[in-house]
Amino acid sequence: MDLANREIIAYNFATRPKFSLVKKMLEQGLSRLKPTECPIIHSDQGVLYGTAEWVKMLEGKAVQSMSRRGNCYDNAVIESFFAILKSECFYSRSYHSIAELQAEIEEYLVYYNEKRIKLAFKGLSPVQYRAQYLS
């Protein structure tokens, strides 16, 4: 998630945590940047984000930031997003397969980025807010 406009810029799916999952997600996110841009990549203290391979992937491309142990406020923005995702996409619905669930999440992420307005952005979606900011 880009903290400037709350846009989901990279995501991936798996049935269990694997390094290939976060590696692909990082590659997706970094591919959207200009070569001169160096983002801050923030994560929790999950085991995948502390590996030597992860740190090496970030070298010269991004600054690593990790949440403090036991401090939920460090990840408040993404936790808020997941609460919204659950309330708007999961509660009171049932899915018959993982593929069906994945398709619904992908559709929701397009909606969230391009159409779902945010009051903090004066009624603009994350993509609209970014476009306005950059123009």
Report the location of each language-model feature.
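Charged DNA-binding/catalytic regions of mobile-element recombinases
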Residues: 1-135
